[in-house]
Amino acid sequence: MINRRMKTGFVFHLLLLLLPLVVLVTSSRRTADDVTLHIIPQHQGAALPDGFYIYQRLNEHGIGIKSITPEDDSIIVRLSSPEQSRAASEVLKSALPQASVIARQPDAIPIWRQKLSQQPFKLG
C-alpha cells in the first residue's frame, strides 16, 4: 500500500514537472508563419470590396487563404503560406487601385519569450 502511494505521488509530481515544458513547447509553435495583408482605403470613407471579391481575385492566381476578416474600415487577409505574400500583394494592388495593401509577417520570436521580456532577445 505504501509502495503504491509512493508510485502515485511520483507520477503526479512528474506530471506537474512536465506540464510547464509541454505548455512552453506548444506555445512557441503559435508563431506559425502567418502572413497577414492589411487592406486600407486610400481615402477616408472610400468603400472596400467584400471578402468574396478578394477571395476570387486571390484564388484565380492560386493563392491560398486562411481567412478574410473585415475590421473597422479595413480588411485583414491571412494567407496559407508566407511565400505567397508578395504575389498576393501584387494581385490585390492591381485589383484594388483605391486601396493600400500592407503585408505583415510575425517575428520569429516565440510568444512566451515576448511576454517574458519587452526587449528583443539579442545574442552577441
Curated annotation (Swiss-Prot):
Cited function: Modulates the activity of the EnvZ/OmpR two-component regulatory system, probably by directly modulating EnvZ enzymatic activity and increasing stability of phosphorylated OmpR.
Subunit structure: Interacts with EnvZ.
Signal peptide: none
Spans through the membrane: 8-28
UniProt membrane topology term: Single-pass membrane protein
Recorded name of the encoding gene: mzrA
Keywords assigned by UniProt, alphabetized: Cell inner membrane, Cell membrane, Membrane, Transmembrane, Transmembrane helix
GO cellular component: plasma membrane
MF terms (GO), sorted A to Z: protein kinase binding
Major localisation: membrane
Cellular localization per UniProt: Cell inner membrane
Native organism taxonomy: Bacteria, Pseudomonadati, Pseudomonadota, Gammaproteobacteria, Enterobacterales
InterPro entries named among the record's database cross-references: Modulator_MzrA, SecD-TM
Species: Musicola paradisiaca (strain Ech703) (Dickeya paradisiaca)
Keyword Nucleotide-binding: no
Residue ranges annotated as Cytoplasmic topological domain: 1-7
Protein name per Swiss-Prot or TrEMBL: Modulator protein MzrA
Family statement: Belongs to the MzrA family.
Keyword Cell wall biogenesis/degradation among UniProt keywords: no
Positions in the Periplasmic compartment: 29-124
